[in-house]
Regions:
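Substrate-binding clefts and catalytic carboxylate motifs of secreted carbohydrate-active enzymes
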Residues: 3-5, 18-30, 35-43, 53-189
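Switch/coupling sub-region of P-loop NTPases
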Residues: 48-49
Length: 189
């Protein structure tokens, strides 16, 4: 089911982009009044703040962030959330970390299942306490081929999946997220 229309993902902030994507957002609102409109908006790295001119045309602000993976300092995430304080709901539209299935080590060893699970635990612990965060979507459900990913861990795959590429093996991060969703379900009952 489609629950939200998205008009973009991490597009550079130019006048042309704003004009085009604001028209897309207005068109989505006009054509389907039953669904909200979103986009993965930009973060101002200097201010560590969600800051995007497109936000005024959206119902929900999306952000992609990879604290603990591309951004090693996890302290950046609570600061980003504190600095932002938008007047609209936010969904974290991408987050995660690579893990080669069955590759083990410590939480500090990138590419291990332990590191990926730790990133998920820290994300959840941080995001669950921020009132304006209304959802999060991990990147991604299962590993997939990606010719640009040539490292020894990735081996031509994007390994951020919660499942292996054959969809048969559930990585530990899958269970971290499952536990969180079960807690949310119990709270709602």
């Amino acid at each position: 089911s489609v629950i939200i229309w998205s008009v973009g993902n991490e597009n550079a902030d130019t006048d042309e982009r704003l004009k085009f994507m604001s028209v897309l957002a207005e068109c989505a609102h006009r054509e389907d009044e039953t669904r909200m409109v979103s986009a993965a908006c930009l973060v101002n790295a200097t201010k560590n703040k969600i800051e995007d001119r497109l936000m005024e045309y959206l119902d929900i602000i999306g952000i992609n962030e990879y604290c603990g993976w591309y951004t090693p300092d996890f302290a950046m995430l609570p600061a980003l959330m504190e600095n932002s304080q938008p007047d609209k709901p936010v969904i974290v539209t991408e987050f995660g970390a690579d893990a080669l299935p069955h590759h083990h080590g410590t939480i500090s060893d990138k590419g291990t299942e332990e590191c990926q699970a730790d990133v998920y635990e820290k994300q959840i612990a941080t995001l669950r306490n921020i009132d304006y965060i209304k959802g999060m979507t991990p990147w991604i459900l299962y590993d997939f081929r990606c010719p640009r990913r040539t490292s020894l861990i990735q081996k031509y795959y994007n390994r951020k999946g919660l499942l292996s590429e054959d969809k048969k093996y559930r990585k530990p991060a899958f269970y971290v997220l499952q536990k969180f969703y079960e807690e949310l379900k119990r709270k709602e009952q």
